[in-house]
Amino acid sequence: MARMVQCIKLGKEAEGLDFPPYPGELGKRLWENVSKEAWAAWLKQQTMLVNENRLNLADLRARQYLARQMEKHFFGEGADVAQGYVPPSN
């Protein structure tokens, strides 16, 4: 049976992550409060931030920026939006 969490991002109970996706205390908070669905949405957002801002993940500052954005995305006011991004209309 899948592990269920009360997802902080989706505001509902959903299937939890299989393991902490990030080291340390932040990884533990993510594992306890974020669903697989919300994590998949973050990975798409993160990819846009990396591509649009031309981040070099070998650079410590780029990795720190992404960690701050991840924390804001799940536990704060929301991550930055990739400049020029227009969400698809349904």
From Swiss-Prot:
It holds the Pfam family Iron_traffic. One of its GO terms (molecular function) is iron ion binding. InterPro entries: Fe_traffick_prot_YggX, Fe_traffick_prot_YggX_sf. GO terms for biological process: cellular response to oxidative stress. Keywords: Iron. It comes from the Bacteria. One of its GO terms (cellular component) is cytosol. Disulfide bonds: none annotated. Could be a mediator in iron transactions between iron acquisition and iron-requiring processes, such as synthesis and/or repair of Fe-S clusters in biosynthetic enzymes. Belongs to the Fe(2+)-trafficking protein family. This is Probable Fe(2+)-trafficking protein.
